[in-house]
UniProtKB/Swiss-Prot annotation:
One of its GO terms (cellular component) is cytosol. Its main location: cytoplasm. Transmembrane segments: none annotated. This is Ribosomal RNA small subunit methyltransferase G. Belongs to the methyltransferase superfamily. RNA methyltransferase RsmG family. The keyword Methyltransferase applies. Its EC number is 2.1.1.170. Specifically methylates the N7 position of guanine in position 527 of 16S rRNA. Gene3D superfamilies: Vaccinia Virus protein VP39. It catalyses: guanosine(527) in 16S rRNA + S-adenosyl-L-methionine = N(7)-methylguanosine(527) in 16S rRNA + S-adenosyl-L-homocysteine. Keywords: Cytoplasm, Methyltransferase, rRNA processing, S-adenosyl-L-methionine, Transferase.
Amino acid sequence: MSVTQRHAEELLQGARELGIELSERQQEQLLAYLGLLIKWNKAYNLTAVRDPDEMVSRHLLDSLSVVPFVAERGDNWLDVGSGGGMPGIPLAIMFPERRFTLLDSNGKKTRFLVQVKLELKLANLEVVHSRVETYRPEQPFDGISSRAFSSLQDFSDWTRHLGSADTHWLAMKGLHPGDELQALPADFRLDATHVLRVPGCQGQRHLLILRRSV
C-alpha cells in the first residue's frame, strides 16, 4: 500500500487540530517520509504499526504534537533511540533551521534513517549509529528527545553526559509514568508535564520535560 490522498487530508487536518499549518514543502516531505516508512517497514521491522492507515496519527501526528515544546527550546537537538525516526524526522522537517541528530544502535534502522535524509534532502539532519552510552559529541545538546525509548531513569542515566544544566529532556510517554518519576536520579527533576491530545489516537499521551542540576 502506498500513500493516498486520504493520508494527505488526514495529515493536514490533524496538523490543524494541533495548531500547526503545514507548508506545501513540509506536507510533501512528511508524506514522502510516510511512503518510505511503509516501504521499508516490510523488510526492516521499523515499527510495530503495520497498517499504513494508522501511521499518520500514531507516528506523524504524534511526533508533531511536541512541536510547540521544541519551538521554544534551543537549536541543537538529539533524538535518542530514534528507531524509525520518530519524532526526529518530523521535527527536522518542521524546523529546517535547527540541527537534529538521530541516534540508534540498530544498523538496519540507521540505514533507513540515512536513506530518508538523502531522499528528503534534510541537510539539518545527522544520523549516528551508536549506543547512547558510548556516544561522545563535541558539545552538549540544547534538547534531548525520546519516544517509547526506555524508563525515565534509564533515559536520564544514559543521556546525562549529553546535556547540561541548560538542556531540556523531552520524554514522550503513553500513560503517565508515576512510578518511573519516583525512580528519577537525584540530579534530575521534573520541570513540566503536558497531556498530549493527538488527533486519531485513542490512548493517553504525555510529554514529560526534565531538567538536570549540574
